[in-house]
Amino acid sequence: QQLVMASAKALGAPRYTRASTLFLELKDSYVSRKASELQVVESFRKPTLLILDEFQERGETDFEQRTLTAIIDLRYGDQTDTLIIANQTKERFYESAGESIADRLRETGGIIECTWPSFRDRQTDPDAGELTGGCQ
């Protein structure tokens, strides 16, 4: 336990957030003035590992695209790890993420597509069989 705590202190803790929460934090900075937009962006730049979940749930507006591209590009330049989770096919992800983000992810580790059925569906259907599919 002490080793884990020391590692987290030395390396910095990972940060998990949903993509939509990232934009809620940015929008809150305009109203609450607790932090500037730059400070919010920096808070997503700093972690040694940033995990963005539910990537497909964002609005895909120009503002969101530019902001995500800026964050991913800053992290790319800093050589820090970013994991994006999206319930999308690889093709749809490329389309929604845009070339810049997709290229950065391919260059720094790749994109893994998992083809098994939704686990959420299994929770509502107790008679569902085994999960089939895999990751490539």
Residue ranges and their predicted role:
Residues 1:
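Walker A/P-loop nucleotide-binding motif
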